[in-house]
């Protein structure tokens, strides 16, 4: 059995886009679960660089770097790892569309919480408590 120190860290960055009380979620190709859009850092990328690249790759839009604001950082245990998700809001330009990596995008309310992973559920909890996410 691994101790907490031995657990692998999955370090991710996510884009929190809320419109009309709903949060944007994406389902990658070949997966059954929806995620907050974003992904893992490549090399020595900063959070901002990761966010801009991942959102361009997944949703074909451009994040406006000057509008990026940190929402919070969340951690959750999964088997054999800890997932850390640094969350940011930002404006964007372009039209949201799925890329070759994404099967489907959808706008979720708090009622859809069971359809996202544990780390995303923590964000959902905070957003509904702040009145930003519809129940």
Regions found by a protein language model. Give the residues of each.
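Conserved Nudix-box catalytic region and its N-terminal flanking loop in Nudix hydrolases
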Residues: 18-58
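Nudix hydrolase/Nudix homology domain
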Residues: 29-34, 98-135
